[in-house]
Amino acid sequence: MGTPRPYSAHSPQESRSSFYSQPSQSPTQPTYGRDDAEDQQQSLLRRSLASPNGWSYDDPNVSTDSLRRYTLHDPGITAFAPPYPESEAADVRSARMSGYSGIEMDAWQRRQGVKPSALRRYGTRKINLVQGSVLSVDYPVPSAIQNAIQAEYRDAEEAFHEEFTHMRYTAATCDPDEFTLRNGYNLRPAMYNRHTELLIAITYYNEDKVLTARTLHGVMQNVRDIVNLKKSEFWNKGGPAWQKIVVCLVFDGIEPCDKNTLDVLATIGVYQDGVMKKDVDGRETVAHIFEYTTQLSVTPTQQLVRPQPNDPSNLPPVQMLFCLKQKNSKKINSHRWLFNAFSRILNPEICILLDAGTKPGSKSLLALWEAFYNDKTLGGACGEIHAMLGRGWRNVLNPLVAAQNFEYKISNILDKPLESAFGYVSVLPGAFSAYRYRAIMGRPLEQYFHGDHTLSKRLGKKGIEGMNIFKKNMFLAEDRILCFELVAKAGYKWHLTYVKASKGETDVPEAAPEYISQRRRWLNGSFAASLYSIMHFGRIYKSGHSFVRMFFLHIQMIYNCCQLIMTWFSLASYWLTSSVIMDLVGTPSSHNKYKAWPFGNDASPIVNFFVKYGYLLVLMLQFVLALGNRPKGTKLAYTMSFLWFSLVQFYVLILSFYLVANAFMGGMIDFDFDQGVGNFLSSFFSSTGGGIVLIALVSTYGIYIVASILYMDPWHILTSSWAYFLGMTTSINILMVYAFCNWHDVSWGTKGSDKADALPSAQTKKADGSKSNFIEEIDKPQADIDSQFEATVKRALAPYQEPKEDSTISLDDSYRNFRTSLVLLWILSNLLVSLLITNDGIRKMCLTNTSTTRTQYYFQVILWATAGLSIFRFIGSIYFLGKSGILCCVTRR
């Protein structure tokens, strides 16, 4: 294997690539030494081939010298920005999964060193295959990356020299389950005999370099938080803390991957162009695995961060494991590489899962780990995910962003604490969650991976190809399946919790089409998974939970059943509630002293008539749109639908508050207790008295406000509640209609990869008289490695320009039939409820003879159920808050 060049301070390689080296003492214009060798290499650099993106190095604006002049001083950190203007970014931007041009394909081939015209004549080296079949090679990293490692780590007694000087590449030609030591595969932390306490995994599909850098840089800052702990007994014994942490990136296919993101990874040393092999002796490579320990990071604003001498805020070394799957095979397959391949070798105690684009907050990963450290029966946990609001919270001006921000906040204040109090959090979001590895081993992971289509042939009828459409939708929310299987694991008493101190920030959809498409997957998956957990609740009895825990799990199941029923009939409930309130206020009757409001006795009924039938007309439009159109193709229609239902909701809210105010001010409620408390309660809670409406309003909006204040997080009430309350109707009439009408839309296929075809193959040879196989590979000089690295850094630090994407959805006719049956059942059941309540012609089936009385009773049931569920959530939230406050005083730190 190649040997890296020495760390000579005067070596021409380091001098030419020294934009990682220490800055000059002059704060304005640094002075850099130049010698003849450097001048020759600069000349050679300019005479070399064009960069992979087609522009020449002759431009003085992009010379290597100019890179040194751009520094950004973050506290204790020096970073480097590209010297060219934003308009040049298009010249260095690689295409994403849609619409690769021939020029970009040619650039990708040049980056991988496929074209003979792009190759120089180098020396070669022989590389022996592990056990005669596994290709695992060490490649020297650029001198600039080597020199960025601080001497205190590089020269430490427990350090391994090659982990800082060489990147290790392994071509995995096997299934994740076969990635084992027995088959010749290994990972550096295991080779170095290091204990992995924390495995931090980032799953990626096609996110741009800004989103990826946001997550990766946030993770590295969190690793620094852990390493800098001074009083920790655990992290400060048995070796340096950074050696107990591994950061794993799993990219779901070469084809959808943003190539600029690969440049970011190459800039910090964990990836190199031209080393991947599409097959080894005809055996197709399934995953390309890179390993390197780095101290470099790239910020979301494309600033390069490196350590400074004697600065406590420096990033520590981070053990990076980068898995680039050759084909797109879905996120669940990425988790199979994480849990069944890498985790079996590293055997981590805790696995933290993040999605690319989720930025963990300060010390958030430490807070997640502490929850497991202080509770040995904790099997899984999640943190608080909140929406990214932009600078100055300007994103809350967008109603969709504001509504989602409020929804996230209320879920973290009411829903997650309630479920945590029971010990079973129904969903630990894959974007920001953690599991104890030994807790999910066995049946939980086995059931979880039934949704991996790459296992369909092996599993047969139990696999994804043998599932009906209901089960396939269930695996759209596969994280819910894993949560249930973990709690119900036979013989164990694992529970789940929510960690308030751990926070993660994520971007949310800002336009209606993206929002609808996202919620389709969430709603269908959660609905199917909720039914799964209810139908398989009996498996809880085989677990090792205590009697008290079992009792509360039963209470939670009853609560979940009530929520499911309320959700199923919510289409009718929203219509009936809106209609009843409009009739109570806008129709002259004895209940309102024959005074219709707000447009008078003549106009109010007419306005309400048009509002109600306009409501039904737009609702019918949603079924037409959902059954035959894509949200991106009918953006205007969906936007207008959102606006209409928001206006109706605003109108109904005004009528509701008027009804309550009029009940108190107009004498509709009898406050005379002389005739007994029963008479007062009867008057207060009658369907026409306004008291029950007051209870429903207070139990909903009032609880939101009180709980937010108790959690000392009330700002979303001021900034985002308006959008959420106005958009409550849209969540049912638009999102659920679209989700159920597209129940059949489940695609699990693997796409081919032209980018994988562009990779070179590895063919083995046998030496005379030797039984071992080897491959012969080009041995590039360090100077050429550094030269190519210059181009990589320029691409990585180029200003980001968002590309335009156009995606299509392929549907299967057999799934449409099930979809139609489900939608018909949903519509008919809600229509039946509406007819039973409002139709005067149906008398023999009901206890009362008038629709008015039935409407009053139904109105009371809906409002009381809403109030009861809200109060139940509030009680659970208060319990969690008190428990957290007590545990905060007694837990180990």
Swiss-Prot record:
Residues 21-31 have a biased composition (Low complexity). One of its GO terms (cellular component) is plasma membrane. Its EC number is 2.4.1.16. InterPro entries: Chitin_synth, Chitin_synth_fun, Chitin_synth_N, Nucleotide-diphossugar_trans. CDD domains: Chitin_synth_C. GO terms for biological process: cell wall organization; chitin biosynthetic process. One of its GO terms (molecular function) is chitin synthase activity. Pfam families: Chitin_synth_1, Chitin_synth_1N. Belongs to the chitin synthase family. Class III subfamily. This is Chitin synthase C. It comes from Aspergillus fumigatus (strain ATCC MYA-4609 / CBS 101355 / FGSC A1100 / Af293) (Neosartorya fumigata). The gene is chsC.
